[in-house]
């Protein structure tokens, strides 16, 4: 039976894990089992945070657009409905940026909605 030398593989795997958990407190960065568990928990939490950030930013963009639109007498719902109906490809992030940085361009969009409604 041939001899299998796998010391380097295990050492490399542990080293990668310990670099991930290097800033953790106590045995969470020293012992392999607890570090492995905490590393997995950290990766799950970071993924959850990235997903949550997308939700939070979308809600923020909607609030900003709604505030800018309501100052001119239109609801957010009407704005989005008009954009879809006329195939204007502006997502919520871009609309929010236009509403903050370039009010004139944003109100041109709103004026076109008001003209169409009558």
From Swiss-Prot:
Transmembrane segments: none
InterPro entries: Ribosomal_bL20, RIBOSOMAL_L20_CS, Ribosomal_protein_bL20_C
Keywords for the protein's UniProt record, in alphabetical order: Plastid, Ribonucleoprotein, Ribosomal protein, RNA-binding, rRNA-binding
Subcellular location(s) per record: Plastid
Name of the featured protein: Large ribosomal subunit protein bL20c
GO MF entry, a single one: rRNA binding
Function (record text): Binds directly to 23S ribosomal RNA and is necessary for the in vitro assembly process of the 50S ribosomal subunit. It is not involved in the protein synthesizing functions of that subunit.
Highest taxon of source: Eukaryota
Chief location category: plastid
GO cellular component: plastid; ribonucleoprotein complex; ribosome
UniProt-listed GO biological process terms: translation
Keyword Transmembrane assigned: no
Ribosomal protein found in the keyword field: yes
One Pfam family here: Ribosomal_L20
Record-stated family: Belongs to the bacterial ribosomal protein bL20 family.
């Amino acid at each position: 039976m041939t001899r299998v030398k796998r010391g380097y593989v295990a050492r490399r795997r542990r080293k990668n894990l310990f670099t991930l958990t290097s800033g953790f407190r106590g045995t969470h960065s020293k012992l392999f089992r607890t570090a492995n568990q905490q590393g997995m928990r950290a990766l799950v939490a970071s993924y959850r945070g990235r997903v949550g950030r997308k939700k939070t930013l979308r809600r923020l963009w909607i609030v900003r657009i709604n505030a800018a639109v309501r100052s001119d007498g239109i609801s957010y719902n009407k704005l989005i409905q008009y954009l879809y109906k006329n195939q204007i490809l502006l997502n919520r992030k871009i609309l929010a940026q236009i509403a903050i940085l370039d009010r004139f361009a944003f109100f041109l969009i709103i004026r076109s909605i008001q003209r169409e409604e009558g």
